[in-house]
Amino acid sequence: MVLSAADKSNVQAAWGKVGGHAADYGAEALERMFLSFPTTKTYFPHFDLSHGSAQVKGHGAKVAAALTKAVGHLDDLPGALSELSDLHAHKLRVDPVNFKLLSHSLLVTLASHLPNDFTPAVHASLDKFLASVSTVLTSKYR
């Protein structure tokens, strides 16, 4: 999915407002995903998945760091996320549908924390961005 100039601007502006909360929002999105889609827990059998657990917070920080990197490389998502794509495809073998579920949970989390900034245009741009990230992360499954 190609991001337009307006999409890129919207994504950068929205992620800029996330600021220092990125790791917290990442953890919150994971918690939302685990609660809303319990089958996603199967990829984390060694995690304490309770609210506020250090492991969920740590993985949320990793998710946030990857998205921050992606926002900084909107013109080269495949290059920026190549190692992460390899990890999820070849080592972790995460079912690709889970990226869509996490993307949805991230959108809900961002909408709840940035209600005044989460316009329909920003929502659409973030959705396209997360779909693009998901496409890159699943590109090496073939």
Curated annotation (Swiss-Prot):
Tissue distribution of the protein: Red blood cells.
Record's keyword terms, sorted: Heme, Iron, Metal-binding, Oxygen transport, Transport
PROSITE patterns documented for this protein: GLOBIN (PS01033)
Residues holding O2: H59
One GO molecular-function entry: peroxidase activity
CC per GO annotation: blood microparticle; haptoglobin-hemoglobin complex; hemoglobin complex
Domain of life: Eukaryota
CDD domains, per the entry: Hb-alpha-like
Domain Globin: 2-142
Alphabetized InterPro entries for the sequence: Globin (IPR000971), Globin-like_sf (IPR009050), Globin/Proto (IPR012292), Hemoglobin_a-typ (IPR002338), Hemoglobin_oxygen_transport (IPR050056), Hemoglobin_pi (IPR002339)
A Pfam family annotated for this UniProt entry: Globin
Residues annotated as binding heme b: H88
UniProt-listed GO biological process terms: hydrogen peroxide catabolic process
Record PANTHER family: HEMOGLOBIN FAMILY MEMBER, HEMOGLOBIN SUBUNIT ALPHA
Family: Belongs to the globin family.
Record's function text: Involved in oxygen transport from the lung to the various peripheral tissues.
Quaternary structure note: Heterotetramer of two alpha chains and two beta chains.
Official protein name in the record: Hemoglobin subunit alpha-1
Organism: Bubalus bubalis (Domestic water buffalo)
Lineage: Eukaryota, Metazoa, Chordata, Craniata, Vertebrata
